């Protein structure tokens, strides 16, 4: 790397003189050095910061600039000129960029020497900072090759000093070719021919090129070179910095001037416009401002089609004038054509004054100040529905919202559907001035408050809930809808006719009287069929298991005498009225579904006399039972009527049913057997076995007529219908008639009647052999079992639970009644039997067998007439007691109304303290009787002592 010959701090002018001196020192024919120096020094040369500094272009800015600005200016100049670059020549070798272009100097003193001076034309040939060549002012472009040929005009023969010139680093031909290529590459588009290029290359060989010694230095050394004035500020004096104005030819078309695409025609209106003229609305303004000075020439040179674009724009989109109906409110002025000025900005269309602007502004009504609203509290909102202010007294009562849907709306619908009917605004009536609220008297205020609907609740709830008349309207609407008749177009539901059942026949009121007593018309009623046996056969075919017991076959059907003359209605009901409660609870288990007993359930209280076909044969009684007895309510709520039993002959022992062995049965089977007799389920197995043994003995061990049976004496007296007047009842006749009965205690294996058949054999899985059972089967009810049952009962009941004894006469013994039985079948002895009572005592007329809380069984004797009288007195005493004034201590009647549990001992003590004497009953009452009374009235009652023998604390 060679060191530079001159230091960067040396002035460039001195360096030039030294250079020339050294170059011509070896040539004797050269002019003097002073002449050369003086000529060379007179040339104004710009300051250079380095050997490779380019000349400053004339269009360079005099201020500081950035790379972005230089790039923008280069792009702008390239866009203005249409450039066609020639194909570049192939270079043999990539050479480094020449720092200083060679300068051609003619040193001949005799011939005119064209010394190149820094003129603007030469500077154009050089490459500017932006890499773009400059144009000449003459209005055309010249090639760099022509400039080179014009400058080098001195022949080589007239310049002998060039032969003695020191050789340059590069040859002359290479230098000229390289310099020409560099100039051609950096100049603007050149349109020179090949002849010019060859001419330039030929003349370049005769040139004496002068070039400085090439200095190879790094980029860091260039930055350290000092310069007196920055090249950005060095501007030649003869170069004008004023911008050249843009000259637009007059005959250029508009598309070439602006390079714009034709604009899409804009639609003025999407609806049919009014028939107006735009002459006056948009007049041509002579004072319209021009956007730029260049647009005036363009507008004058624009074709007529472009100028009249707005005249025909509306015709393309608007409807024809013939189709548009002229509106009465259209302005009468005719509008002129639109302005003929085409500008970039949108033309502001002037709109003429409308007719509305000519109408004088009406005086706006003066708004009256709204009266101050009093702040309303929640209580005020809640009580606003009850205030009478602002309401018209003579106005019709407002109908409920719900009742309006039930009214016929035919007239209203016809009125609204009429085509001529129009909605009319309701006439506003002036509100009457509210009168001052009249102060009512105390009595009137009380009456008004009594008629007022009170709604209870908090004030916030009352403010949000429905109006107080909502519930009242709801109930009124429900009542009105219920009163409506059925739909006449709906098909009626044909229900099967049902006769009167025991539920309706035995219905009683609050006082115990029969309700809806049916009166039979004996005159117009249809006659009975000629063949009475047909009814019995039909019943036997429907339910053969009920009419004919198992094991009894080849029996002849008896004759049923249905004599209408023996029907009596009034007397049986009169007798029932005498013993209301007794008859109500007499045969609650008579309608059981057991097959070994058949209950009499006639739909009407008629007398049905059973006439046996043969007196010597043992026939079971045929019962006219209701076919639909399965669909009836429980037997405890029904009143049955029982027929008098016919005389029964003795049945041979061969037809006896063996006694079942309850010991081998399971608990489930024992529970079913207990429920079949009408008892509730018993927890202990031994108690169930003992109870079943007693029931079996009471059913199968007793013999005799029905008149001698003490258990059904009351039933036969109250429920057996009488015959015609003057005749005694069949039950009484059967009781008085002498009957044959064996003397002494009857045998266990004997059967009192042929109809005494049980379903035990059908339910037990164990098969029993036919014939007489063994003797050990009759003593299954051991005394230990009876003691267990007696120990679990109250003292009054335990004395009555004993082994049945021999009784000489038991005509006054009451029947056994099972209350609140859950089983389907109850203990329903047939009137044809005369069994002994299950729990009876010969010393007492009526025995209470009601078991309390200590046992799970509920046994009670049918209330007799004496008990019915006692119950009536208890009811009267409880209801007639004065009301209590202490809320903490209500009366007994108030407790019952509030469904409070009644302590039986306390109520019995209260009744015995003089309340029964007050109502006319001379005697005392036991807690067990009070319990029976509570159960008959469905009153919640309990014992003071619990199951474990402890006293209840919270009562």
Curated annotation (Swiss-Prot):
Q: Where does this protein have compositionally biased stretches of type Basic residues?
A: 123-137, 209-225, 738-748, 767-776
Q: Does Iron show up as a keyword for this record?
A: no
Q: Which residues form the signal peptide?
A: none
Polar residues: bias regions? 150-159, 352-362, 579-601
Region: Disordered, residue numbers: 75-173, 189-231, 352-376, 539-608, 621-648, 705-784, 819-846
In which broad location class does this protein mainly occur, judging by the first location in its UniProt entry?
nucleus
Q: What PTMs does it carry?
A: Phosphorylated in response to DNA damage.
| Gene Ontology biological process | DNA recombination; DNA repair; DNA replication; regulation of DNA-templated transcription
Q: Name one GO cellular component term.
A: Slx1-Slx4 complex
Provide the family line: Belongs to the SLX4 family.
Its subunit composition reads: Forms a heterodimer with SLX1.
- Which protein, by its recorded name, is this? Structure-specific endonuclease subunit SLX4
Species this protein is from: Pyricularia oryzae (strain 70-15 / ATCC MYA-4617 / FGSC 8958) (Rice blast fungus)
């Amino acid at each position: 790397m060679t060191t530079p010959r001159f230091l960067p701090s040396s002035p460039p002018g001195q360096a030039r003189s030294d250079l020339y001196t050294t170059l011509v020192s070896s040539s004797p024919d050269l002019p003097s050095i002073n002449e050369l120096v003086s000529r060379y020094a007179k040339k104004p040369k710009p300051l250079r910061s380095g050997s490779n500094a380019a000349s400053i272009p004339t269009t360079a800015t005099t201020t500081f600039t950035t790379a972005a600005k230089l790039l923008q200016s280069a792009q702008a100049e390239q866009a203005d000129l249409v450039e066609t670059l020639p194909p570049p020549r192939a270079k043999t070798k990539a050479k480094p960029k020449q720092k200083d272009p060679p300068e051609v100097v003619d040193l001949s003193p005799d011939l005119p020497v064209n010394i190149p001076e820094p003129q603007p034309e030469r500077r154009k040939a050089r490459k500017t900072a932006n890499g773009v060549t400059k144009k000449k002012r003459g209005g055309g472009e010249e090639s760099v090759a022509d400039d080179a040929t014009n400058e080098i005009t001195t022949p080589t023969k007239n310049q002998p000093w060039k032969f003695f010139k020191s050789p340059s680093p590069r040859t002359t031909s290479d230098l000229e070719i390289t310099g020409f290529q560099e100039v051609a590459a950096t100049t603007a588009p050149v349109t020179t021919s090949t002849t010019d290029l060859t001419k330039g290359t030929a003349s370049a060989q005769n040139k004496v090129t002068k070039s400085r010694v090439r200095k190879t230095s790094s980029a860091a050394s260039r930055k350290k070179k000092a310069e007196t004035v920055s090249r950005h500020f060095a501007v030649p004096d003869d170069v004008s910095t004023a911008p050249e104005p843009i000259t637009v030819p007059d005959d250029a078309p508009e598309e070439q001037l602006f390079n714009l695409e034709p604009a899409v025609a804009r639609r003025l209106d999407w609806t049919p416009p009014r028939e107006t003229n735009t002459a006056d609305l948009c007049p041509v303004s002579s004072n319209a401002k021009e956007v730029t000075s260049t647009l005036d020439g363009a507008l004058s040179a624009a074709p007529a089609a472009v100028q009249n674009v707005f005249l025909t724009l509306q015709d393309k989109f608007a409807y024809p004038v013939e189709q548009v109906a002229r509106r009465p409110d259209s302005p009468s002025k005719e509008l002129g054509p639109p302005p003929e000025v085409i500008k970039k900005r949108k033309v502001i269309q002037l709109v003429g004054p409308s007719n509305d602007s000519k109408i004088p502004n009406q005086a706006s009504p003066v708004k009256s100040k709204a009266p101050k609203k009093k702040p309303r509290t929640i209580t005020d909102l809640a009580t606003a529905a009850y205030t009478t202010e602002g309401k018209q007294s003579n106005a019709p009562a407002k109908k409920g919202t719900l009742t309006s849907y039930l009214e016929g709306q035919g007239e209203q619908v016809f009125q609204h559907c009429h085509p001529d009917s129009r909605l009319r605004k309701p006439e506003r009536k002036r509100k009457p001035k509210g009168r001052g609220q009249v102060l009512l008297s105390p009595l009137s205020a009380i009456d008004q408050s009594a008629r007022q609907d009170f709604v209870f609740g908090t004030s916030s709830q009352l403010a949000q809930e429905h109006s107080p008349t909502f519930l009242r309207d709801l109930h009124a609407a429900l009542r009105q809808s219920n009163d409506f008749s059925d739909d006449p177009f709906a098909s009626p539901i044909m229900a099967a006719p049902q006769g009167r059942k025991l539920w309706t026949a035995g219905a009683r009121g609050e006082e115990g009287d029969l309700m809806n007593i049916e009166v039979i018309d004996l005159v117009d009623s249809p006659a009975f069929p000629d063949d009475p046996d047909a009814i019995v056969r039909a019943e036997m075919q429907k339910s053969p298991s009920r009419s004919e017991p198992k094991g009894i076959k080849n029996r002849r059907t008896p004759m049923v005498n249905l004599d209408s003359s023996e029907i009596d209605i009034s007397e049986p009901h009169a007798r029932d009225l005498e013993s209301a409660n007794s008859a109500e609870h007499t045969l609650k288990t008579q309608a059981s579904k057991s097959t070994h007993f058949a209950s009499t359930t006639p739909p009407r209280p008629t007398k049905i006399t059973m006439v046996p076909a043969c007196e010597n044969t043992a026939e079971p009684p045929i019962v006219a039972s209701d076919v639909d007895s399965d669909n009836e309510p429980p037997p405890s709520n029904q009143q049955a009527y029982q027929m008098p039993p016919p005389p029964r002959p003795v049945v041979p022992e061969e037809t006896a049913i063996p006694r079942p062995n309850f010991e081998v049965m399971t608990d489930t089977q024992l529970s079913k057997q207990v429920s079949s007799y009408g008892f509730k389920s018993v927890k202990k197995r031994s108690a169930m076995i003992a109870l079943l043994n007693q029931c079996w003995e009471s059913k199968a061990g007793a013999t005799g007529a029905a008149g001698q049976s003490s258990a059904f004496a009351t039933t036969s007296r109250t429920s057996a219908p009488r015959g015609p007047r003057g005749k005694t009842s069949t039950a009484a006749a059967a009781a008085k008639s002498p009957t044959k009965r064996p003397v002494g205690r009857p045998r266990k294996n004997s059967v009192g009647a042929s109809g005494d058949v049980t379903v035990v054999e059908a339910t037990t899985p164990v098969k029993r052999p036919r014939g007489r059972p063994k003797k050990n089967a009759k003593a299954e009810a051991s005394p230990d079992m009876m003691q267990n049952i007696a120990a679990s009962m109250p003292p009054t009941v335990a004395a009555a639970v004993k082994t049945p004894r021999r009784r000489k006469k038991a005509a006054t013994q009451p029947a056994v009644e099972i209350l609140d039985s859950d089983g389907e079948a109850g203990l329903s002895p047939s009137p044809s039997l005369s069994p002994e009572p299950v729990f009876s005592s010969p010393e007492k007329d009526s025995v209470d067998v009601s078991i309390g809380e200590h046992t799970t069984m509920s046994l009670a004797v049918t209330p007799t007439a004496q008990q019915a009288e006692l119950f009536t007195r208890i009811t009267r005493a409880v209801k007639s007691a004065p009301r209590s004034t202490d809320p903490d201590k209500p009366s007994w009647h108030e407790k019952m109304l509030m469904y409070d549990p009644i302590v039986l001992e306390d109520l019995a003590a209260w009744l015995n303290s003089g309340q029964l004497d007050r109502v006319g009953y001379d005697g005392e009452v036991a807690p067990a009787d009070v319990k029976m009374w509570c159960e008959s009235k469905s009153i919640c009652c309990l014992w003071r002592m619990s199951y474990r023998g402890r006293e209840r604390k919270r009562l």
